[in-house]
Structures are given as structure tokens and as C-alpha cells.
Amino acid sequence: MQHSQVSPNARQQLAETVVLNKARLGLSWQDLADGTGLALTFVTAALLGQHALPEAAARKVAAQLGLDDDAVLLLQSIPLRGSIPGGIPSDPTIYRFYEMLQVYGSTLKALVHEQFGDGIISAINFKLDIKKVEDPEGGSRAVITLDGKYLPTKPF
């Protein structure tokens, strides 16, 4: 049976332990995701407290990280989602995503509604991918794919 968290504190504390053990053991997020049958981005988000992991995946990553049975249960619990308390993020990387939505949010909304109609793009039935590609002008570029199911508004 799945259980739900009533506070983000336990998952935040576990996320801090995950990051510390990951560093101590020299593991990458990909190392932790490998063999779970789940996407790198999903496993990373789960280990940072944003998703529940299936039992087999929770046991696998807990074993890699040296976590106990309580951590395995916690990794399977449904978290209180949302990792940006207090509104505007101060971390520069997260802020850039906030800034992108400040600049392009109304454009995305207009194009979604024009192409799909009145509704939303789900963040539950959702896939996220990130790839590093070479920039022809030098350096690297990040290609981020947000793939969410369109859910139309239904009058009632």
C-alpha cells in the first residue's frame, strides 16, 4: 500500500542523505537510474524528493546508496511535490528556468490553446529528457524536452 507524506521534511532530509552518499560513493544519477527500468530524470526527481519510486527501484537505489529499510519505505511514499519554497527561486540554474517561463510562458500558453484548445499540459502524465549537444558556434547546448499529455477542459 502506498502512503502519502504530510510534510516535505522527511523527503528533504532523505534527499540530502542521497546526495551525500552519492558523492561519497562516486556515483552519478545515471548509475543510480541504471537497472531500475525508469528514466534518468524520473529517478533523479524521485531521489530529490519529487516522486515515489516503485518498490523494486527503491530497493535497488537504496542498496547502491547504503540506505536502510526506512529509507526504502520513504522512497516509495507519495511526496508533497514542489521544490521551490517561498516563490521566486534564488539558485541560478533553477532561476533560469523560472526566467524562461517568465519570457515564454504566455507564448507557450497561446500556442497550446491555439493548437490543442482550452486545456493544460499534464505534469503527471509527463516525460522529461535532457541531452547535452555540441553547439556549432562552440561550447555546449542543453536540449530539454518536456513531453506532457494534453488534457482538455471539460465543461460541467
Curated annotation (Swiss-Prot):
Q: Which Gene3D superfamilies match?
A: Cyanate lyase, C-terminal domain, lambda repressor-like DNA-binding domains
Entry protein name:
Cyanate hydratase
HAMAP family per the record? Cyanate_hydrat
What InterPro entries does the database record attribute to this sequence? Cyanase, Cyanate_lyase_C, Cyanate_lyase_C_sf, CYNS_N, Lambda_DNA-bd_dom_sf
Which Enzyme Commission numbers does its entry carry?
Answer: 4.2.1.104
Gene symbol? Answer: cynS
**From what organism does this protein derive?**
Pseudomonas aeruginosa (strain ATCC 15692 / DSM 22644 / CIP 104116 / JCM 14847 / LMG 12228 / 1C / PRS 101 / PAO1)
Listed A to Z, the keywords are: Lyase
Give the classification, highest ranks.
Bacteria, Pseudomonadati, Pseudomonadota, Gammaproteobacteria, Pseudomonadales
Q: Which residues form a coiled coil?
A: none
